[in-house]
Protein backbone atom coordinates (compact mmCIF):
# COMPACT_ATOMS: atom_id res chain seq x y z
CA UNK A 1 0.00 0.00 0.00
CA UNK A 2 1.27 3.49 -0.83
CA UNK A 3 2.00 6.02 1.86
CA UNK A 4 -1.21 8.03 2.26
CA UNK A 5 -2.70 10.48 4.72
CA UNK A 6 -5.24 7.88 5.77
CA UNK A 7 -5.91 4.17 5.59
CA UNK A 8 -7.38 3.30 2.19
CA UNK A 9 -8.20 -0.25 3.25
CA UNK A 10 -11.22 0.71 5.37
CA UNK A 11 -13.15 3.04 3.06
CA UNK A 12 -16.83 2.77 2.23
CA UNK A 13 -17.64 2.34 -1.49
CA UNK A 14 -18.60 6.03 -1.67
CA UNK A 15 -15.37 7.13 0.03
CA UNK A 16 -13.36 4.83 -2.21
CA UNK A 17 -14.84 6.28 -5.40
CA UNK A 18 -14.34 9.81 -4.10
CA UNK A 19 -10.71 9.01 -3.37
CA UNK A 20 -10.23 7.42 -6.78
CA UNK A 21 -11.79 10.42 -8.51
CA UNK A 22 -9.41 12.71 -6.62
CA UNK A 23 -6.51 10.45 -7.58
CA UNK A 24 -7.50 10.86 -11.21
CA UNK A 25 -7.10 14.62 -10.82
CA UNK A 26 -3.76 14.13 -9.05
CA UNK A 27 -2.54 11.96 -11.92
CA UNK A 28 -3.73 14.50 -14.49
CA UNK A 29 -1.90 17.25 -12.59
CA UNK A 30 1.24 15.12 -12.63
CA UNK A 31 0.84 14.54 -16.36
CA UNK A 32 0.50 18.26 -17.10
CA UNK A 33 3.40 19.28 -14.89
CA UNK A 34 5.65 16.70 -16.48
CA UNK A 35 4.47 17.61 -19.98
CA UNK A 36 2.99 14.21 -20.75
CA UNK A 37 -0.28 15.84 -21.77
CA UNK A 38 -1.31 19.36 -22.74
CA UNK A 39 -4.36 21.28 -21.61
CA UNK A 40 -6.31 20.17 -24.69
CA UNK A 41 -5.60 16.52 -23.80
CA UNK A 42 -6.91 16.70 -20.24
CA UNK A 43 -10.58 16.03 -21.03
CA UNK A 44 -9.79 12.94 -23.09
CA UNK A 45 -7.35 11.59 -20.50
CA UNK A 46 -9.81 12.26 -17.65
CA UNK A 47 -12.67 10.48 -19.39
CA UNK A 48 -10.43 7.54 -20.27
CA UNK A 49 -9.39 7.18 -16.62
CA UNK A 50 -12.96 7.53 -15.36
CA UNK A 51 -13.98 4.74 -17.71
CA UNK A 52 -11.13 2.46 -16.62
CA UNK A 53 -11.98 3.04 -12.96
CA UNK A 54 -15.77 2.75 -13.40
CA UNK A 55 -16.37 6.25 -12.04
CA UNK A 56 -19.51 8.17 -12.98
CA UNK A 57 -18.10 11.68 -12.72
CA UNK A 58 -14.88 13.55 -11.94
CA UNK A 59 -13.96 14.84 -8.52
CA UNK A 60 -15.10 18.30 -7.54
CA UNK A 61 -12.31 18.60 -4.99
CA UNK A 62 -9.00 20.17 -5.95
CA UNK A 63 -5.97 17.87 -5.76
CA UNK A 64 -3.17 18.80 -3.34
CA UNK A 65 -0.33 20.88 -4.76
CA UNK A 66 2.19 18.06 -4.86
CA UNK A 67 4.83 17.35 -7.47
CA UNK A 68 6.35 13.90 -6.91
CA UNK A 69 9.29 12.84 -9.06
CA UNK A 70 7.43 9.74 -10.25
CA UNK A 71 3.77 8.65 -10.18
CA UNK A 72 4.62 5.28 -8.60
CA UNK A 73 3.06 5.84 -5.15
CA UNK A 74 -0.07 7.42 -6.63
CA UNK A 75 -0.50 4.55 -9.08
CA UNK A 76 -0.04 2.04 -6.26
CA UNK A 77 -2.97 3.63 -4.43
CA UNK A 78 -5.17 3.72 -7.52
CA UNK A 79 -4.46 0.07 -8.27
CA UNK A 80 -5.29 -0.95 -4.69
CA UNK A 81 -8.58 0.94 -4.76
CA UNK A 82 -9.44 -0.52 -8.17
CA UNK A 83 -8.74 -3.99 -6.81
CA UNK A 84 -11.12 -3.29 -3.93
CA UNK A 85 -13.74 -2.42 -6.55
CA UNK A 86 -13.02 -5.81 -8.13
CA UNK A 87 -12.16 -4.26 -11.48
CA UNK A 88 -9.60 -7.08 -11.74
CA UNK A 89 -8.43 -9.95 -9.55
CA UNK A 90 -6.27 -8.16 -7.01
CA UNK A 91 -4.83 -11.43 -5.73
CA UNK A 92 -2.85 -11.82 -8.97
CA UNK A 93 0.19 -9.58 -8.99
CA UNK A 94 0.54 -9.54 -12.78
CA UNK A 95 -3.00 -8.20 -13.12
CA UNK A 96 -2.09 -5.38 -10.73
CA UNK A 97 0.97 -4.48 -12.78
CA UNK A 98 -0.95 -4.63 -16.05
CA UNK A 99 -3.78 -2.47 -14.72
CA UNK A 100 -1.32 0.12 -13.43
CA UNK A 101 0.28 0.30 -16.88
CA UNK A 102 -3.16 0.66 -18.44
CA UNK A 103 -3.93 3.63 -16.20
CA UNK A 104 -0.69 5.40 -17.06
CA UNK A 105 -1.26 4.65 -20.73
CA UNK A 106 -4.08 7.20 -20.68
CA UNK A 107 -1.45 9.94 -20.36
CA UNK A 108 0.96 8.69 -22.99
CA UNK A 109 1.79 10.66 -26.12
CA UNK A 110 1.30 8.78 -29.37
CA UNK A 111 4.23 6.89 -30.88
CA UNK A 112 4.42 9.34 -33.82
CA UNK A 113 4.58 12.30 -31.43
CA UNK A 114 7.42 10.72 -29.46
CA UNK A 115 9.41 10.01 -32.62
CA UNK A 116 8.84 13.52 -33.96
CA UNK A 117 9.98 15.15 -30.71
CA UNK A 118 13.04 12.90 -30.44
CA UNK A 119 14.15 13.62 -34.00
CA UNK A 120 13.60 17.36 -33.59
CA UNK A 121 15.73 17.43 -30.44
CA UNK A 122 18.42 15.30 -32.08
CA UNK A 123 18.69 17.63 -35.08
CA UNK A 124 18.51 20.92 -33.17
CA UNK A 125 20.23 20.13 -29.86
CA UNK A 126 22.12 16.89 -30.40
CA UNK A 127 21.99 13.24 -29.39
CA UNK A 128 22.33 13.83 -25.65
CA UNK A 129 19.37 16.22 -25.53
CA UNK A 130 17.24 13.72 -27.45
CA UNK A 131 18.05 10.78 -25.18
CA UNK A 132 17.72 12.95 -22.06
CA UNK A 133 14.16 13.80 -23.05
CA UNK A 134 13.23 10.26 -24.10
CA UNK A 135 14.69 8.72 -20.94
CA UNK A 136 12.87 11.22 -18.72
CA UNK A 137 9.61 10.46 -20.53
CA UNK A 138 10.07 6.79 -19.68
CA UNK A 139 10.75 7.66 -16.02
CA UNK A 140 7.80 10.05 -15.75
CA UNK A 141 5.38 7.50 -17.17
CA UNK A 142 6.63 4.81 -14.77
CA UNK A 143 7.70 2.68 -17.74
CA UNK A 144 11.13 2.62 -16.11
CA UNK A 145 10.33 1.22 -12.68
CA UNK A 146 12.57 3.49 -10.62
CA UNK A 147 10.88 2.62 -7.32
CA UNK A 148 11.50 -1.09 -7.89
CA UNK A 149 15.03 -0.52 -9.19
CA UNK A 150 15.87 1.38 -5.99
CA UNK A 151 15.19 -1.82 -4.03
CA UNK A 152 18.18 -3.57 -5.62
CA UNK A 153 21.11 -4.31 -3.31
CA UNK A 154 24.39 -3.13 -4.79
CA UNK A 155 28.03 -3.07 -3.77
CA UNK A 156 31.54 -3.24 -5.24
CA UNK A 157 34.16 -5.91 -4.60
CA UNK A 158 37.89 -5.41 -5.11
CA UNK A 159 39.54 -8.08 -7.28
CA UNK A 160 42.86 -8.45 -9.16
CA UNK A 161 41.02 -7.03 -12.19
CA UNK A 162 39.73 -3.93 -10.44
CA UNK A 163 36.42 -3.44 -8.69
CA UNK A 164 33.51 -5.59 -9.85
CA UNK A 165 29.94 -4.39 -9.35
CA UNK A 166 27.47 -6.72 -7.66
CA UNK A 167 23.68 -6.39 -7.85
CA UNK A 168 21.11 -8.58 -6.13
CA UNK A 169 18.20 -8.08 -8.49
CA UNK A 170 14.98 -7.35 -6.61
CA UNK A 171 13.23 -5.41 -9.38
CA UNK A 172 11.27 -8.04 -11.24
CA UNK A 173 8.28 -9.11 -9.13
CA UNK A 174 8.21 -12.75 -8.13
CA UNK A 175 5.28 -14.79 -9.37
CA UNK A 176 2.65 -15.65 -6.78
CA UNK A 177 1.13 -19.17 -6.75
CA UNK A 178 -2.12 -17.97 -8.32
CA UNK A 179 -0.23 -16.38 -11.22
CA UNK A 180 1.69 -19.59 -11.82
CA UNK A 181 -1.55 -21.59 -11.82
CA UNK A 182 -3.24 -19.18 -14.25
CA UNK A 183 -0.24 -19.25 -16.58
CA UNK A 184 -0.70 -22.99 -17.00
CA UNK A 185 -4.25 -22.37 -18.23
CA UNK A 186 -3.25 -19.53 -20.57
CA UNK A 187 -3.55 -20.54 -24.25
CA UNK A 188 -0.32 -20.23 -26.19
CA UNK A 189 0.08 -17.04 -28.16
CA UNK A 190 2.67 -16.01 -30.70
CA UNK A 191 1.81 -12.33 -30.45
CA UNK A 192 3.97 -10.45 -29.83
CA UNK A 193 6.63 -12.94 -30.95
CA UNK A 194 8.92 -11.89 -28.08
CA UNK A 195 9.43 -9.16 -25.48
CA UNK A 196 11.54 -7.10 -27.91
CA UNK A 197 9.30 -6.99 -30.97
CA UNK A 198 8.03 -3.58 -32.06
CA UNK A 199 4.47 -4.94 -31.76
CA UNK A 200 4.82 -4.56 -27.99
CA UNK A 201 3.96 -0.85 -28.28
CA UNK A 202 0.58 -0.36 -26.61
CA UNK A 203 0.02 -4.08 -26.04
CA UNK A 204 -2.54 -4.78 -23.30
CA UNK A 205 -0.64 -7.69 -21.79
CA UNK A 206 -1.84 -10.97 -20.36
CA UNK A 207 -1.13 -13.15 -17.35
CA UNK A 208 2.25 -14.24 -18.74
CA UNK A 209 3.13 -11.13 -20.74
CA UNK A 210 3.49 -7.58 -19.41
CA UNK A 211 1.23 -4.73 -20.49
CA UNK A 212 3.02 -2.18 -22.66
CA UNK A 213 0.66 0.80 -22.98
CA UNK A 214 3.48 3.04 -21.72
CA UNK A 215 6.07 1.55 -24.07
CA UNK A 216 7.51 3.77 -26.80
CA UNK A 217 10.35 3.18 -29.27
CA UNK A 218 12.28 5.51 -31.57
CA UNK A 219 13.40 4.46 -35.08
CA UNK A 220 17.13 4.63 -35.82
CA UNK A 221 19.07 3.41 -38.85
CA UNK A 222 22.26 1.45 -38.16
CA UNK A 223 24.52 0.55 -41.08
CA UNK A 224 21.54 0.59 -43.43
CA UNK A 225 19.31 -1.56 -41.21
CA UNK A 226 16.16 -0.39 -39.40
CA UNK A 227 16.39 -0.58 -35.62
CA UNK A 228 14.44 0.96 -32.75
CA UNK A 229 15.77 2.52 -29.57
CA UNK A 230 13.98 1.81 -26.30
CA UNK A 231 14.82 1.76 -22.60
CA UNK A 232 14.72 -1.23 -20.29
CA UNK A 233 11.86 -1.06 -17.74
CA UNK A 234 13.98 -2.82 -15.09
CA UNK A 235 17.27 -1.10 -15.81
CA UNK A 236 20.47 -2.72 -14.56
CA UNK A 237 22.47 0.51 -15.00
CA UNK A 238 21.92 4.18 -15.85
CA UNK A 239 19.94 4.78 -19.03
CA UNK A 240 19.97 1.07 -19.85
CA UNK A 241 18.79 1.05 -23.46
CA UNK A 242 18.04 -1.63 -26.03
CA UNK A 243 18.37 -1.32 -29.79
CA UNK A 244 16.12 -3.90 -31.45
CA UNK A 245 15.95 -4.88 -35.10
CA UNK A 246 12.63 -4.15 -36.77
CA UNK A 247 12.32 -7.82 -37.73
CA UNK A 248 12.07 -10.76 -35.35
CA UNK A 249 15.24 -12.44 -36.54
CA UNK A 250 17.99 -14.31 -34.65
CA UNK A 251 21.09 -12.75 -33.15
CA UNK A 252 24.10 -12.69 -35.46
CA UNK A 253 27.76 -11.83 -35.01
CA UNK A 254 29.48 -10.75 -38.20
CA UNK A 255 30.86 -7.78 -40.12
CA UNK A 256 27.42 -6.19 -40.36
CA UNK A 257 26.87 -6.54 -36.60
CA UNK A 258 30.09 -4.68 -35.83
CA UNK A 259 29.21 -2.00 -38.38
CA UNK A 260 25.85 -1.48 -36.64
CA UNK A 261 27.51 -1.13 -33.23
CA UNK A 262 29.99 1.44 -34.56
CA UNK A 263 27.19 3.33 -36.29
CA UNK A 264 25.20 3.50 -33.05
CA UNK A 265 28.11 4.87 -31.01
CA UNK A 266 28.85 7.28 -33.86
CA UNK A 267 25.30 8.63 -33.60
CA UNK A 268 25.14 8.45 -29.79
CA UNK A 269 28.74 8.93 -28.59
CA UNK A 270 27.67 9.38 -24.96
CA UNK A 271 26.41 5.78 -24.85
CA UNK A 272 28.22 2.47 -24.55
CA UNK A 273 26.92 -0.19 -26.94
CA UNK A 274 27.46 -3.94 -26.86
CA UNK A 275 25.99 -7.15 -28.14
CA UNK A 276 25.43 -10.52 -26.62
CA UNK A 277 27.07 -13.40 -28.43
CA UNK A 278 25.07 -15.27 -31.04
CA UNK A 279 25.50 -18.80 -29.65
CA UNK A 280 23.73 -20.64 -26.81
CA UNK A 281 25.39 -20.84 -23.37
CA UNK A 282 27.59 -17.79 -24.04
CA UNK A 283 24.73 -15.64 -25.38
CA UNK A 284 22.04 -13.75 -23.51
CA UNK A 285 18.53 -14.78 -22.58
CA UNK A 286 17.04 -13.70 -25.93
CA UNK A 287 18.81 -15.17 -28.97
CA UNK A 288 15.71 -15.09 -31.17
CA UNK A 289 15.63 -11.32 -31.76
CA UNK A 290 18.61 -9.34 -33.01
CA UNK A 291 19.38 -6.52 -30.59
CA UNK A 292 22.08 -4.53 -28.81
CA UNK A 293 22.24 -3.08 -25.32
CA UNK A 294 23.86 0.06 -24.02
CA UNK A 295 23.60 3.01 -21.72
CA UNK A 296 25.24 6.05 -20.22
CA UNK A 297 27.45 4.15 -17.83
CA UNK A 298 31.12 3.32 -17.28
CA UNK A 299 31.43 -0.40 -16.64
CA UNK A 300 34.22 -2.06 -14.66
CA UNK A 301 35.61 -3.62 -17.84
CA UNK A 302 36.07 -0.17 -19.36
CA UNK A 303 38.30 0.78 -16.42
CA UNK A 304 40.57 -2.25 -16.94
CA UNK A 305 44.10 -1.77 -18.28
CA UNK A 306 45.87 -3.49 -21.14
CA UNK A 307 48.12 -6.21 -19.72
CA UNK A 308 49.96 -7.09 -22.95
CA UNK A 309 50.26 -4.26 -25.51
CA UNK A 310 50.28 -5.47 -29.12
CA UNK A 311 50.48 -3.95 -32.58
CA UNK A 312 49.48 -4.84 -36.13
CA UNK A 313 51.71 -2.97 -38.59
CA UNK A 314 48.92 -3.06 -41.16
CA UNK A 315 46.88 -0.73 -38.96
CA UNK A 316 49.19 1.87 -37.37
CA UNK A 317 46.20 3.95 -36.27
CA UNK A 318 44.87 1.22 -33.99
CA UNK A 319 46.35 0.43 -30.58
CA UNK A 320 45.68 -3.06 -29.33
CA UNK A 321 46.34 -5.38 -26.45
CA UNK A 322 45.24 -8.21 -24.22
CA UNK A 323 43.06 -6.83 -21.44
CA UNK A 324 43.68 -7.49 -17.75
CA UNK A 325 40.25 -9.05 -17.41
CA UNK A 326 38.90 -12.44 -16.26
CA UNK A 327 36.91 -12.98 -19.47
CA UNK A 328 39.56 -13.19 -22.20
CA UNK A 329 39.30 -9.94 -24.13
CA UNK A 330 41.16 -7.93 -26.76
CA UNK A 331 41.05 -4.14 -26.60
CA UNK A 332 41.29 -1.98 -29.71
CA UNK A 333 41.66 1.81 -29.57
CA UNK A 334 41.57 4.18 -32.52
CA UNK A 335 39.98 7.25 -34.08
CA UNK A 336 39.12 5.73 -37.45
CA UNK A 337 35.87 3.82 -37.27
CA UNK A 338 36.67 1.96 -40.50
CA UNK A 339 40.17 0.91 -39.41
CA UNK A 340 38.80 -0.25 -36.07
CA UNK A 341 36.13 -2.31 -37.83
CA UNK A 342 38.71 -3.84 -40.17
CA UNK A 343 40.88 -5.00 -37.26
CA UNK A 344 37.85 -6.23 -35.31
CA UNK A 345 36.64 -8.23 -38.31
CA UNK A 346 40.08 -9.79 -38.70
CA UNK A 347 39.97 -10.92 -35.06
CA UNK A 348 36.40 -12.20 -35.34
CA UNK A 349 37.13 -14.10 -38.55
CA UNK A 350 40.29 -15.65 -37.11
CA UNK A 351 38.59 -16.59 -33.84
CA UNK A 352 35.65 -18.27 -35.56
CA UNK A 353 37.98 -20.94 -36.98
CA UNK A 354 40.62 -21.01 -34.24
CA UNK A 355 41.49 -24.24 -32.45
CA UNK A 356 44.07 -24.78 -29.71
CA UNK A 357 43.55 -28.17 -28.13
CA UNK A 358 46.31 -27.51 -25.59
CA UNK A 359 43.92 -25.14 -23.78
CA UNK A 360 40.67 -26.88 -24.66
CA UNK A 361 39.57 -24.59 -27.50
CA UNK A 362 37.87 -26.27 -30.45
CA UNK A 363 36.33 -24.13 -33.18
CA UNK A 364 33.69 -26.73 -33.98
CA UNK A 365 32.45 -30.22 -33.19
CA UNK A 366 30.81 -32.25 -35.96
CA UNK A 367 30.12 -29.06 -37.86
CA UNK A 368 28.63 -27.20 -34.88
CA UNK A 369 30.47 -23.87 -34.34
CA UNK A 370 31.70 -22.96 -30.87
CA UNK A 371 33.65 -19.70 -31.20
CA UNK A 372 32.14 -16.22 -31.16
CA UNK A 373 32.67 -12.85 -29.49
CA UNK A 374 30.92 -10.42 -27.16
CA UNK A 375 31.76 -6.89 -28.41
CA UNK A 376 31.54 -3.73 -26.28
CA UNK A 377 32.18 -0.28 -27.77
CA UNK A 378 32.36 3.21 -26.33
CA UNK A 379 33.80 6.54 -27.42
CA UNK A 380 36.36 8.61 -25.57
CA UNK A 381 37.02 12.20 -26.66
CA UNK A 382 40.73 11.80 -25.98
CA UNK A 383 41.40 8.37 -27.48
CA UNK A 384 38.52 7.82 -29.89
CA UNK A 385 36.70 4.51 -30.25
CA UNK A 386 37.48 1.85 -27.63
CA UNK A 387 36.33 -1.66 -28.51
CA UNK A 388 36.60 -4.65 -26.20
CA UNK A 389 36.15 -8.02 -27.89
CA UNK A 390 35.53 -10.79 -25.37
CA UNK A 391 36.39 -14.16 -26.91
CA UNK A 392 33.76 -16.81 -26.22
CA UNK A 393 33.44 -20.58 -26.67
CA UNK A 394 30.29 -22.58 -25.90
CA UNK A 395 31.68 -26.13 -25.96
CA UNK A 396 30.43 -28.65 -23.40
CA UNK A 397 31.93 -31.86 -22.02
CA UNK A 398 31.03 -34.72 -19.71
CA UNK A 399 32.74 -32.89 -16.86
CA UNK A 400 31.04 -29.59 -17.72
CA UNK A 401 27.68 -30.39 -19.36
CA UNK A 402 26.46 -26.80 -18.91
CA UNK A 403 29.53 -25.39 -20.62
CA UNK A 404 33.30 -25.61 -20.24
CA UNK A 405 33.57 -21.80 -20.30
CA UNK A 406 30.47 -21.26 -18.18
CA UNK A 407 29.96 -20.92 -14.39
CA UNK A 408 31.24 -24.16 -12.89
CA UNK A 409 29.07 -26.22 -10.59
CA UNK A 410 30.90 -25.21 -7.40
CA UNK A 411 29.69 -21.63 -7.97
CA UNK A 412 26.09 -22.39 -8.94
CA UNK A 413 24.92 -21.46 -5.44
CA UNK A 414 25.73 -17.87 -6.41
CA UNK A 415 25.54 -17.76 -10.21
CA UNK A 416 24.55 -20.50 -12.64
CA UNK A 417 22.97 -18.51 -15.46
CA UNK A 418 24.74 -17.58 -18.70
CA UNK A 419 27.51 -15.01 -18.58
CA UNK A 420 26.05 -12.51 -21.00
CA UNK A 421 27.03 -9.04 -22.11
CA UNK A 422 26.30 -7.27 -18.82
CA UNK A 423 28.20 -9.81 -16.72
CA UNK A 424 31.13 -9.80 -19.16
CA UNK A 425 31.45 -6.06 -18.50
CA UNK A 426 31.85 -6.74 -14.77
CA UNK A 427 28.31 -6.17 -13.50
CA UNK A 428 26.84 -9.19 -11.70
CA UNK A 429 23.08 -9.63 -11.82
CA UNK A 430 22.37 -12.10 -9.03
CA UNK A 431 19.10 -13.78 -7.97
CA UNK A 432 16.84 -12.24 -5.31
CA UNK A 433 17.17 -15.32 -3.08
CA UNK A 434 20.68 -14.16 -2.13
CA UNK A 435 19.27 -11.24 -0.14
CA UNK A 436 17.86 -13.44 2.63
CA UNK A 437 20.35 -16.25 2.20
CA UNK A 438 23.29 -13.87 2.45
CA UNK A 439 21.85 -12.32 5.62
CA UNK A 440 21.38 -15.77 7.15
CA UNK A 441 24.95 -16.79 6.32
CA UNK A 442 26.19 -13.57 7.94
CA UNK A 443 24.22 -14.50 11.07
CA UNK A 444 26.03 -17.86 11.14
CA UNK A 445 29.41 -16.11 10.94
CA UNK A 446 28.31 -13.77 13.74
CA UNK A 447 27.18 -16.67 15.93
CA UNK A 448 23.56 -15.49 15.82
CA UNK A 449 22.19 -18.71 14.31
CA UNK A 450 23.40 -22.31 14.05
CA UNK A 451 24.70 -23.74 10.80
CA UNK A 452 21.91 -26.09 9.73
CA UNK A 453 22.81 -26.10 6.03
CA UNK A 454 23.54 -29.86 6.10
CA UNK A 455 20.09 -30.71 7.37
CA UNK A 456 17.57 -32.06 4.82
CA UNK A 457 15.42 -29.34 3.27
CA UNK A 458 17.36 -26.47 4.84
CA UNK A 459 17.02 -23.19 2.94
CA UNK A 460 20.81 -22.81 2.94
CA UNK A 461 21.52 -26.36 1.72
CA UNK A 462 22.66 -25.07 -1.67
CA UNK A 463 25.41 -23.12 0.14
CA UNK A 464 26.53 -25.90 2.52
CA UNK A 465 30.05 -26.37 1.12
CA UNK A 466 30.56 -22.62 0.77
CA UNK A 467 29.40 -21.97 4.33
CA UNK A 468 31.94 -24.53 5.61
CA UNK A 469 34.67 -22.64 3.74
CA UNK A 470 33.53 -19.31 5.18
CA UNK A 471 33.42 -20.68 8.74
CA UNK A 472 36.94 -22.08 8.30
CA UNK A 473 38.11 -18.66 7.11
CA UNK A 474 36.19 -16.31 9.42
CA UNK A 475 34.94 -18.41 12.34
CA UNK A 476 31.56 -17.78 13.99
CA UNK A 477 32.30 -14.87 16.32
CA UNK A 478 32.38 -11.92 13.94
CA UNK A 479 30.70 -8.61 14.61
CA UNK A 480 27.40 -8.55 12.67
CA UNK A 481 28.46 -5.63 10.46
CA UNK A 482 31.79 -7.32 9.70
CA UNK A 483 30.01 -10.58 8.88
CA UNK A 484 27.73 -8.79 6.41
CA UNK A 485 30.71 -7.14 4.75
CA UNK A 486 32.54 -10.46 4.57
CA UNK A 487 29.63 -12.25 2.92
CA UNK A 488 29.25 -9.48 0.33
CA UNK A 489 32.97 -9.54 -0.38
CA UNK A 490 32.95 -13.31 -0.77
CA UNK A 491 29.96 -13.15 -3.14
CA UNK A 492 31.94 -10.69 -5.25
CA UNK A 493 34.96 -13.00 -5.20
CA UNK A 494 32.79 -15.89 -6.40
CA UNK A 495 31.59 -13.69 -9.26
CA UNK A 496 35.21 -13.00 -10.25
CA UNK A 497 35.82 -16.77 -10.34
CA UNK A 498 32.69 -17.24 -12.46
CA UNK A 499 34.07 -14.72 -14.95
CA UNK A 500 37.38 -16.60 -14.93
CA UNK A 501 35.41 -19.77 -15.74
CA UNK A 502 34.06 -17.95 -18.80
CA UNK A 503 37.56 -16.96 -19.92
CA UNK A 504 38.78 -19.12 -22.81
CA UNK A 505 42.42 -18.33 -22.02
CA UNK A 506 43.02 -18.91 -18.32
CA UNK A 507 44.94 -16.56 -16.05
CA UNK A 508 47.94 -18.89 -15.69
CA UNK A 509 51.14 -18.86 -17.72
CA UNK A 510 49.91 -21.49 -20.18
CA UNK A 511 46.64 -19.68 -20.77
CA UNK A 512 48.22 -16.28 -21.32
CA UNK A 513 50.87 -17.75 -23.63
CA UNK A 514 48.06 -19.35 -25.63
CA UNK A 515 46.31 -15.97 -25.81
CA UNK A 516 49.45 -14.39 -27.28
CA UNK A 517 49.68 -17.22 -29.83
CA UNK A 518 46.15 -16.50 -30.98
CA UNK A 519 46.89 -12.80 -31.36
CA UNK A 520 50.03 -13.62 -33.34
CA UNK A 521 47.95 -15.84 -35.63
CA UNK A 522 45.84 -12.79 -36.47
CA UNK A 523 48.92 -10.71 -37.31
CA UNK A 524 49.71 -8.99 -34.02
CA UNK A 525 53.09 -8.72 -32.33
CA UNK A 526 53.97 -7.72 -28.80
CA UNK A 527 54.57 -3.99 -28.68
Over which residues does each language-model region extend?
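Intrinsic structural disorder
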Residues: 1-2, 265
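Helical scaffold of the NTase/Pol beta-like nucleotidyltransferase catalytic core
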Residues: 214-216, 246-271
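Active-site microenvironments that recognize anionic phosphate/pyrophosphate groups
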Residues: 2-243, 247-250, 324-326, 340-344, ...
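Beta-rich nucleic-acid/ligand-interaction surfaces
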Residues: 280-288, 366-372
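Catalytic or ion-translocation cores adjacent to nucleophile or general acid/base/metal-coordination motifs
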Residues: 256, 265-285, 294-348, 352-355
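Coil-to-beta-strand transition motifs
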Residues: 238, 270-272, 285-287, 300, ...
Amino acid sequence: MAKNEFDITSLTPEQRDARLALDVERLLRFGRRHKLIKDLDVLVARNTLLDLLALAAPSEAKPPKEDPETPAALLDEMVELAAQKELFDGAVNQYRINFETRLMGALMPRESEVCKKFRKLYVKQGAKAATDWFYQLCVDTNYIRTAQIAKNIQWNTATPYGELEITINLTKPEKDPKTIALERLQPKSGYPACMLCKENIGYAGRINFPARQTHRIVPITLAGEQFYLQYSPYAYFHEHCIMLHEQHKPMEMNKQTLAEIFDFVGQFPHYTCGSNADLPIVGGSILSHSHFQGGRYVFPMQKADIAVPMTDIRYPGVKAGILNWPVSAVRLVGRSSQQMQNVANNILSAWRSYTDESVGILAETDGTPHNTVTPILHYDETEGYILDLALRNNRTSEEYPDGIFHPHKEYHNIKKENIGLIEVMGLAILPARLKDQGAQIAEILAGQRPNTSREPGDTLAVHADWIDELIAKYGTHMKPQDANKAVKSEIGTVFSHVLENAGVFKQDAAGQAAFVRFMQSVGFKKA
